[in-house]
Amino acid sequence: MSHQFSFEKLEVWYLAKEFSKRIYAVTKKFPIEERFGLTAQLTRAAISVASTIAEGSARASKKDQAHFSQLAYGSLMEIACQLIISCELGYLNNTVYQEVRDKMEKISNKLNALRNYQLRAFSSQAKRTP
């Protein structure tokens, strides 16, 4: 296998990437008039989660990495809000909504765990620095 970037080794990145593909599939069924509304918002935010995890992995300090993990979490919460609205507008049925929500919960838990690890590692580095 060819070289893997550090973000490609993160399970949370893989889950976020797969999640973004699922969001694309789900939003294809939205009304055409939502193409520049909810559809665009959801797909951009979904891509942002995986992309921000990748970008954060390239940061030199654990503090910066944790900041990007927090930004990715923020994008995930944006998606949560938009999915609730989509469901209430009748664009998603409850089964699809719950399936996507379950995936988000798993990503959310892993993102929080990653961020906590990064912050602990930063704290350890700061304590060792004279």
Roles of regions detected by a PLM:
Residues 1-55, 59-130:
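Short, C-terminally biased terminal segments at protein or domain edges
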